């Protein structure tokens, strides 16, 4: 069962802010969350049934720190289309 803690953050980038005007919310989650689980989270915690959910997996970048090679954490990103007129107070999460 998915929980609200599976949502790491709501992404605020230039692209995501322009998509918010058309009713699409960009959410960053853990890599083990599926579309169905995210749909359940939105229904249970926000009272909204998403119209469409698109997902992509973002691999962590390889970075160097003090001569050592490391890797940033991988994550999953979801584009969630919410119904027109639905209010989602993202800051209250």
UniProtKB/Swiss-Prot annotation:
Pfam families: Ribosomal_L23. Coiled coil: none annotated. GO terms for molecular function: rRNA binding; structural constituent of ribosome. One of its GO terms (biological process) is translation. Keywords: Ribonucleoprotein, Ribosomal protein, RNA-binding, rRNA-binding. InterPro entries: Nucleotide-bd_a/b_plait_sf, Ribosomal_uL23-like, Ribosomal_uL23/eL15/eS24_sf. One of its GO terms (cellular component) is ribosome. It comes from the Bacteria. The keyword Transmembrane does not apply. One of the early assembly proteins it binds 23S rRNA. One of the proteins that surrounds the polypeptide exit tunnel on the outside of the ribosome. Forms the main docking site for trigger factor binding to the ribosome. Part of the 50S ribosomal subunit. Contacts protein L29, and trigger factor when it is bound to the ribosome. Belongs to the universal ribosomal protein uL23 family. This is Large ribosomal subunit protein uL23. It comes from Helicobacter hepaticus (strain ATCC 51449 / 3B1). The gene is rplW.
